């Protein structure tokens, strides 16, 4: 039995050091050298202060800001520690109630808007942390944001177009708008007026 104990203990120690110390340290160094922004969370800074991450959505509910997708990480919205597949099933009455509540909130915030409400404005993403919305969801909100900020609709529309990312490699994913980056750009325009 002793003859098996030493090699087993040595293997545990060696592989613990390799996989628990050396490999993570090597990956961290490579990430910091090759992709420092992404390795540190893709943080967005404005005036020397961190405003958030381009990878995790934030709660915006003021009329002068674009609103993102619903967060499924209750009770604290966009809590990365609570991320999970927490969407209701399609037959769950709670889903219909949540969607109707969001529709009512969107209509109350912009009663004159006759555009169809995009589905991503009334449903949560699988993770509940989605930082992006569709261009249709951004376009739906242009009039409300422009009116709340006293800006021309065309100016806000142009900002949405500037912040629309196209499909990756031309075929992967869908066009999308990062809500935090768009709202930061709005704040910069407003501060110039």
UniProtKB/Swiss-Prot annotation:
Pfam families named in the record? KdpC
Q: Name one GO cellular component term.
A: plasma membrane
- InterPro entries from the xrefs? KdpC (IPR003820)
Q: Where are the transmembrane segments?
A: 10-30
> What does the UniProt entry say about where the protein is found?
Cell membrane
Report the main location listed first in the record. membrane
Q: Which UniProt keywords apply?
A: ATP-binding, Cell membrane, Ion transport, Membrane, Nucleotide-binding, Potassium, Potassium transport, Transmembrane, Transmembrane helix, Transport
Q: Mind listing the GO molecular function terms for this protein?
A: ATP binding; P-type potassium transmembrane transporter activity
Annotated membrane topology: Single-pass membrane protein
Instruction: Please report which protein family the annotation says this sequence is part of.
Output: Belongs to the KdpC family.
The function of this protein is:
Part of the high-affinity ATP-driven potassium transport (or Kdp) system, which catalyzes the hydrolysis of ATP coupled with the electrogenic transport of potassium into the cytoplasm. This subunit acts as a catalytic chaperone that increases the ATP-binding affinity of the ATP-hydrolyzing subunit KdpB by the formation of a transient KdpB/KdpC/ATP ternary complex.
Oligomeric form and interacting partners:
The system is composed of three essential subunits: KdpA, KdpB and KdpC.
Annotated protein name in UniProt: Potassium-transporting ATPase KdpC subunit
């Amino acid at each position: 039995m002793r003859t098996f104990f030493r090699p087993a203990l040595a293997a545990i120690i060696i592989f613990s050091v390799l996989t628990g110390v050396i490999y993570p340290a090597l990956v961290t160094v490579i990430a910091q050298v090759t992709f420092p922004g992404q390795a540190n969370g893709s943080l967005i800074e404005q005036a020397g202060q961190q405003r958030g991450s381009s990878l995790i959505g934030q709660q915006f509910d003021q009329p002068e800001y674009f609103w993102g997708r619903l967060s499924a990480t209750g009770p604290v919205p966009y809590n990365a520690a609570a991320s999970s597949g927490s969407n209701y099933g399609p037959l769950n009455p709670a889903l219909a109630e949540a969607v109707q509540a969001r529709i009512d909130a969107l209509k109350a915030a912009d009663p004159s808007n006759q555009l169809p409400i995009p589905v991503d404005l009334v449903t949560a993403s699988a993770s509940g942390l989605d930082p992006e919305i569709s261009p249709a969801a951004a376009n739906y909100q242009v009039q409300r944001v422009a009116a709340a900020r006293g800006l021309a609709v065309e100016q806000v529309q142009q900002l949405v177009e500037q912040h629309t990312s196209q499909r990756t490699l031309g075929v992967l994913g869908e066009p999308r708008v990062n809500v935090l980056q768009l709202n930061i750009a709005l704040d910069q325009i407003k501060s110039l007026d």
